Amino acid sequence: MIRMLRFGAKALAVLALATLSQAAAAGGNSTKDTPAEPVERGVYFSGYDVVTDSRYTYSGIIVALNGDMGRDGFFARAYGAYGNFDQNPGDGRQWQGDVALGYMFTRSSIGYEIYAGVDYQNVRLRPDDPTAEVRGTEWGFKVGAGIETEKELPYYFRLEGNYSTAFNSYWARARVGVNRGRFTFGPEASVVGDEDFDAQRVGGFVTFDVKLPQFRPMELTLSVGHQFVSGSNNNTDGTGGIGGGEGTYGLVNLSVTF
């Protein structure tokens, strides 16, 4: 009887070890077959905007302070831009940069972000015009916010904007569209201005992924439409100003996560 109990105990031990070994092997194969996606710590973006009598180049970076853009948390943001524009007479140059701290969170497949920081703007006119409302250097307080649907949804919506006390400048844009595989497209509308001008844009956009070997997927956005202007930019001679004149606009934007 004792021998039978010992034999049974040994058999159970062998069976338990075999079961654990199979479970460990299965777990190892599962991890190997479905590797975890890399965590996105931030995003870099850059673009070029052109409209009648105005050219504008910008770059920026957003970094999640918790190390994961997919989680709720604080982020740091830096942005810089350079523009040149034609006026009557002469031309002008514009430099702008800001640094900000913000918070992002997701609820029901919709992402939200808010941020605030310090803004720097410098505008130089040639020839100089002492009567111009937007001229010289100004520091200001900048606030911004955005809302965007997640990419997994069949439809797309994004609303974003910001305001700075430097020259009372503002910008806002709304996009609605549909997601079709790698492509997202639809209409867009935006407003931009400062103490010197106001402009409104209506057009369309398309966004798609660009995949290159050894690189993370990049997102490219193209948009085109018409700009309407008022204020000092609405010159009778057709020459624009700091925000450009009335006419066709085009935008190229590239973003990549890291």
Predicted regions mapped to residue ranges:
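N-terminal signal peptide c-region/cleavage motif recognized by signal peptidases
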Residues: 20-21
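Hydrophobic, lipid-facing positions within transmembrane beta-strands of outer-membrane proteins
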Residues: 42, 55-59, 63, 95-99, ...
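Predominantly the C-terminal beta-signal and adjacent terminal strand-loop region
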Residues: 181-258
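Conserved binding-pocket/active-site segment within a compact domain
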Residues: 170-175, 186, 190
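Short glycine/proline- and aromatic-enriched beta-strand/turn motifs that initiate or cap beta-hairpins
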Residues: 24-88, 228, 236, 249, ...
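Outer-membrane pore/translocation modules
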Residues: 74-169, 189, 224-248, 256
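Short loop/turn motifs that connect adjacent beta-strands in outer-membrane beta-barrel proteins
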Residues: 27-41, 64-75, 106-112, 150-156, ...
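Bacterial N-terminal signal peptides that target proteins for export
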Residues: 2-12
